[in-house]
Curated annotation (Swiss-Prot):
Terpene synthase (TPS) involved in the biosynthesis of monoterpene natural products included in conifer oleoresin secretions and volatile emissions; these compounds contribute to biotic and abiotic stress defense against herbivores and pathogens. Catalyzes the conversion of (2E)-geranyl diphosphate (GPP) to (-)-beta-phellandrene. One of its GO terms (cellular component) is chloroplast. Belongs to the terpene synthase family. Tpsd subfamily. This is (-)-beta-phellandrene synthase 2, chloroplastic. It holds the Pfam family Terpene_synth. Keywords: Chloroplast, Lyase, Magnesium, Metal-binding, Plastid, Transit peptide. The Asp-Asp-Xaa-Xaa-Asp/Glu (DDXXD/E) motif is important for the catalytic activity, presumably through binding to Mg(2+). The keyword Magnesium applies.
Length: 624
């Protein structure tokens, strides 16, 4: 299993041709968007989710996954705006960038608006604002200087609002802890203990003022960046979660209440920077009454809106390229599988928001889409004989090896072959060395893990948890989804760095583990109903006689929590010899793929939250 759920494969006769799933028309969605279910512009048809066992063209009955059809067709391009690609908007953006840089500099020039009693929180506020609005890439030097200044005043008790503050401040300390830690500064979570009373509760007044609530918001946000063994961060998360949920029941609807709701919804390891920026744009500075602060938020907000919309013109070009690849590769002939290339491109655009990372976005979308097709081929459509043949032939990496394969497998063989070669050429341009054989080995290991699961399905074998989990981390697909796309970036990955972010590194192991664990908690019931027994849940129950599903889920959720903390440490360890910039995109791939499982199996049921993500971050511009 990969980043999708699975159903049992048929293991009888060999089939050489694809099946065609029937599509049933159900109730329409309220929003008009382009889909393959449209019979004419403006008419949306919800695709079918029915299960079936159709007879293929050569008379052999094969299972289908019952997944709904592709939600998007080529008309999606029409919905992407190119208006903000005009030079005038870019020129306005450049002027705003200069003005925001002046905002950073004005703090250091002792502007009358700032004083030694509030300068630390003001500095942290502007750094936090540009990061949450998705515009921080323009201010790397300013952010570094600002955080160096804040860190120079950091103490074992935290910091106050300003350099001359006598008493440490919870809001400043919590925001400082989070921001400094995310930038690799060695700050200890122990500072939070100074804000706890004897009962372990965090000191706050019962008045629930806006300032009080913002302190707890930042305490909650800081608690999510926990490292293994930090009990005070666990206590902070429990306290702040309860406090904020109760506060939402009492305070009136406002930008603050919406921000609190968004923060509680956006847990750290499924947080997508572009989605966060889109949501924060809607609440940033809405209720600001201070005239000078309002002028600052307006500049930041205008720049954030421009950046968001300008990026859409680039997305249109990239998506057009992806759709051509999908069509030219013949994916429309592969009717037994899900087609999620648009969804995967959206996820890529949400984690790699820098314009220069086009090859990463397209490479990630292509790799993930191929993973999905292979998953459905191994779990649903292929027979054991066909799959064993495909597994053996792919290791030859020779187009002539397709002669003995069924027609549908020939197509997939060549798609994989061409994609791996294409991205290897791009990687050689970026990295200055040949990585083709390295990438091929990663794909071979991945396909071997699929073959192992196919054998378990065919024989009805239920492995032990450890046996299943070790194979499942490979079959999660995280490694092959991340490896070649990151190598196409303008970030150097010499061998000594690559081995610290790719297999067999701890970072890769944990990222793969969380995808397998969370994926199984979202998919196991549907998989079991279709006849596939093996999952983390069922294997845990086998190893622990008498354990219930609830026991298994509780255990796995606890493991996931620990894995997230371990991932935080692998990314942010201040003593690591590997820079955060080299690890960040592997970490972000984990976040993107994990997002697909945040609410449900969003890769098999992509017409709810996953569809909403496409609409909000790809198709809809931000209004001015």
């Amino acid at each position: 299993m990969a980043i999708v759920s699975s159903v049992p494969l048929a293991s009888k006769s060999c089939l050489h041709k694809s099946l065609i799933s029937s599509i049933h028309k159900l109730k329409p969605f309220c929003r008009t968007i382009p889909t393959l279910g449209m019979s004419r512009p403006g008419k949306y048809v919800m695709p079918s989710m029915s299960m079936s066992s159709p007879v293929s063209d050569d008379g052999v009955q094969r299972r289908t996954g019952g997944y709904h059809s592709n939600l998007w067709n080529d008309d999606i391009i029409q919905f992407l705006s190119t208006t903000y690609g005009e030079p005038a908007y870019r020129e306005r953006g450049e002027r705003l960038i200069d003005e925001v840089k002046n905002m950073f500099n004005s703090i250091s020039m002792e502007d009358v608006e700032f004083s030694p009693l509030n300068d630390l929180i003001q500095r942290l506020w502007i750094v936090d604002s540009v990061e949450r609005l998705g515009i921080d890439r323009h201010f790397k030097n300013e952010i570094k200087s600002t955080l160096d200044y804040v860190y120079s005043y950091w103490t074992q008790k935290g910091i106050g609002c300003g350099i001359e503050s006598v008493v440490p401040d919870l809001n400043s300390t919590a925001l400082g802890l989070r921001t400094l830690r995310l930038h690799g500064y060695p700050v200890s979570a122990e500072v939070l203990k100074h804000f706890q009373n004897q009962n372990g509760q965090f000191a706050c007044s019962p008045s629930e003022t806006e300032g009080e609530m913002r302190s707890i918001v930042n305490l909650y946000r800081a608690s999510l960046i926990a490292f293994p063994g930090e009990k005070v961060m666990e206590e902070a998360e429990i306290f702040s979660t309860k406090y904020l949920k109760e506060a939402l029941q009492k305070i009136p609807v406002s930008s603050l209440s919406r921000e609190i709701g968004d923060v509680l919804e956006q847990d750290w390891h499924t947080n997508l920077p572009r989605l966060e920026a889109r949501n924060y744009i809607d609440v940033f500075g809405q209720d600001t009454k201070d005239t000078k602060l309002y002028m600052k938020t307006e500049k930041l907000l205008e720049l954030a809106k421009l950046e968001f919309n300008i990026f859409q013109s680039l997305q249109k070009t990239e998506l057009d390229s992806l759709l051509r690849w999908w069509k030219d590769s013949g994916f429309h002939h592969i009717t037994f599988s899900r087609h999620l290339h648009v969804e995967y491109y959206t996820l890529a655009s949400c984690i790699a928001i820098e314009p220069q990372h086009s090859r990463f976005r397209l490479g990630f979308a292509k790799a993930c889409h191929v993973i999905t097709i292979l998953d459905d081929m191994y779990d649903v459509f292929g027979t054991i004989d066909e799959l064993e043949l495909f597994t053996a032939q792919i290791k030859r990496w020779d187009p002539s090896a397709t002669d003995c394969l069924p027609k549908y497998m020939k197509r997939m063989y060549m798609i994989l072959y061409d994609m791996v070669n294409e991205m290897s050429r791009e990687a050689e341009t970026a990295q200055g060395r040949d990585t083709l054989n390295y990438a091929r080995q990663a794909w071979e290991d991945f396909i071997d893990s699929y073959m192992q699961e196919a054998k378990w399905i065919a024989t009805g074998y239920l492995p032990t948890f450890d046996e299943y989990f070790e194979n499942g981390k490979v079959s999660s697909g995280h490694r092959v989804a991340a490896l070649q796309p990151i190598l196409t970036m303008d970030i150097p990955f010499p061998h000594d760095i690559l081995k610290e972010v790719d297999f067999p590194s701890k970072l890769n192991d944990l990222a793969s583990a969380i995808l397998r664990l969370r994926g199984d908690t979202r998919c196991y019931k549907a998989d079991r109903a279709r006849g596939e027994e093996a999952s983390c849940i069922s294997c845990y129950m086998k190893d622990n006689p008498g354990a219930t599903e609830e026991d298994a889920l509780s255990h796995i959720n606890a493991v996931i929590s620990d894995v997230i903390k371990g991932l935080n440490w692998e990314l942010l360890n201040p003593n690591s010899s590997v820079p955060i910039s080299s690890k960040k995109h592997v970490f972000d791939v984990s976040r993107a793929l994990h997002y697909g499982y945040k609410y449900r199996d969003g890769y098999s049921v992509s017409n709810i939250e996953t569809k909403s993500l496409v609409m909000r971050t790809l198709l809809e511009s931000v209004p001015f």
